[in-house]
């Protein structure tokens, strides 16, 4: 028996990169997985690699609260519960404050901060009612380390850290766990546009393994934060 047999997991941003790697690994470990993201074709491509009776594609824009609410309802209607939610949807744009690209700021705030909050508020009522569940937010090293072109992105990921820390306190003694995972540079299509090819990068699978580690700790153990860096 695999370690997540019959657990029901929702993964946002599951159409590519880190989200795809997480969804695939959770499925390999026995979970029934709901794939969420904006691009239905990409989600379906991921789903086609998995057993069809244990995967569900739900196109979802995490900046739309109603769509996120519906996502959680569909997960429960399809598989009969909700055990794991991975907030992997994210947006990284190279946008300085002094570039004055307010539309880019709004977009990152909507995806990275509001998307995290909308997903939490949609999942937590069920988890609290059943006194179990695990919410994992994919943050970033950039939430701790700022470059001259990452101010807005770094601020949004710092917010994800703060949200996770606050939730840990709010959820204490409820049986519901919450974790943030902060990757360093990961080799994805998003990062390829902004970073030199010779810079050391993690593989998306490395982040998926960190997620699995957090999920498979004993019931009385909550891993609040994991930082993953390339060496």
Swiss-Prot record:
The organism that produces this protein has a lineage beginning with:
Bacteria, Bacillati, Bacillota, Bacilli, Bacillales
Active site positions: 153
For the protein in the UniProt heading, the enzyme class is: oxidoreductase
Give me the residues that bind NADP(+), please.
10-34
Name of protein: Uncharacterized oxidoreductase SA2266
User: Keywords in UniProt for this one?
Assistant: Oxidoreductase
Q: Mind telling me which Pfam families this protein's record contains? A: adh_short
Q: Write out the residues that bind substrate.
A: 140
Enzyme Commission no: 1.-.-.-
